[in-house]
Amino acid sequence: MPSDREGLWMLAAFALMTLFLLDNVGVTQAKSFDDVRCKCICPPYRNISGHIYNRNFTQKDCNCLHVVDPMPVPGNDVEAYCLLCECKYEERSTNTIRVTIIIFLSVVGALLLYMLFLLLVDPLIRKPDPLAQTLHNEEDSEDIQPQMSGDPARGNTVLERVEGAQQRWKKQVQEQRKTVFDRHKML
């Protein structure tokens, strides 16, 4: 029986393989109008307003004579009009854009789920902190030692190590407060 981690890896591998197969199927249709185009931007010319023309042409045919149809100027002004037009060949992969967006949204969604999980589990894991209660009651911390559950050398789990680090940090902060406020000394 596979563990949860192995199951997640298998699911991720299956999802990547599915995306790869869908991408390969889409390659046959990839050269659509949205992926490959010739874009000509023509400024205003005499009494004709400016216009942007988008057509599906090859890179070698990407010029004003092929893309601008119907030609808005009479035959003798075509060359002058086309010299003003700026034509660019543009190519992009919508499948790559889609896959990138899907991966980005998946990562953001996983992080949000993890955050919600931590928000729900955190109150269940936290124990009342006797050190924090002493700070609120303004009692002297030298008389009260923080209670450690179990053997101090046992801190094997991440949670126990984090709680130990928090206890040490809180003790340091309390000592600093005592030094500054009671003894009026700066560090």
From Swiss-Prot:
The UniProt keyword set, sorted, is: Membrane, Transmembrane, Transmembrane helix
Question: Which GO CC annotations does the UniProt entry carry?
Answer: late endosome; lysosomal membrane; lysosome
Which family is it part of? Belongs to the TMEM9 family.
Biological source species:
Takifugu rubripes (Japanese pufferfish)
Query: Per its record, how is this protein called by name?
Result: Putative protein 2
Q: What is its main location?
A: membrane
The signal peptide annotation in the UniProt record is none
Q: Which locations, inside or outside the cell, does it occupy?
A: Membrane
What kind of membrane protein is this, topologically? Multi-pass membrane protein
One Pfam family hit: Tmemb_9
Against InterPro entries, the record matches this protein to: TMEM9/TMEM9B
Which residue ranges traverse the bilayer? Answer: 10-27, 99-121
**Taxonomic superkingdom:** Eukaryota
